């Protein structure tokens, strides 16, 4: 197993904030159930808690305890993931309010990037995923851009490549099918 990822997963479990590659850009991640870690991540980004955050997992099974899904919705997600598609799904009461922000739904994804999925697997739970940048600035696409913009505020940066041609993930409301970000 990749020692680099093991270190990042341990830092997440200990309440740290890490940067890691996803399909399109580098993401920032932490333990979604650790309020202090999430608040630290939001402070790094200069992002208000009210906006909510994306939760990624290694599989739908890892995300399911925090979601309200019927069988049809579960089957739909199983067919679509892993992929750079984020769905807005009704959140269960097990998901902290600081992850959802002002919303009753939570944004969730099973990424189509092996390092991001492995990081969730090694952390043993879903993790936060938000672009590695200060809000309003361009998202970082490599570890050097992450280090230049956020380096001394992060506990760890995972090495890896993003797809240079990829766009940020599509966002779809699972219930209505409405595309919120193409």
From Swiss-Prot:
**Disulphides:** none
Where does the YrdC-like domain lie?
2-182
Classify the main location.
cytoplasm
Q: What class of enzyme is it?
A: transferase
Key word Cytoplasm present in the record?
A: yes
Catalysed reactions listed for this entry: L-threonine + hydrogencarbonate + ATP = L-threonylcarbamoyladenylate + diphosphate + H2O
Quote a single Gene Ontology cellular component term: cytoplasm
Can you say where in the cell this protein is located?
A: Cytoplasm
Would you kindly state one Gene Ontology biological process term found in this protein's UniProt entry? regulation of translational fidelity
- Keywords carried by this UniProt record: ATP-binding, Cytoplasm, Nucleotide-binding, Nucleotidyltransferase, Transferase, tRNA processing
Query: What does the record give under GO molecular function?
Result: ATP binding; double-stranded RNA binding; L-threonylcarbamoyladenylate synthase; tRNA binding
Question: EC?
Answer: 2.7.7.87
The record, for PANTHER family, names: SUA5, THREONYLCARBAMOYL-AMP SYNTHASE
State the family named in the UniProt similarity comment for this chain.
Belongs to the SUA5 family. TsaC subfamily.
Q: What does this protein do?
A: Required for the formation of a threonylcarbamoyl group on adenosine at position 37 (t(6)A37) in tRNAs that read codons beginning with adenine. Catalyzes the conversion of L-threonine, HCO(3)(-)/CO(2) and ATP to give threonylcarbamoyl-AMP (TC-AMP) as the acyladenylate intermediate, with the release of diphosphate.
| Name of the protein in its database record | Threonylcarbamoyl-AMP synthase
Q: Say which species the protein is native to.
A: Alcanivorax borkumensis (strain ATCC 700651 / DSM 11573 / NCIMB 13689 / SK2)
Per the UniProt record, the lineage of the source organism begins with: Bacteria, Pseudomonadati, Pseudomonadota, Gammaproteobacteria, Oceanospirillales
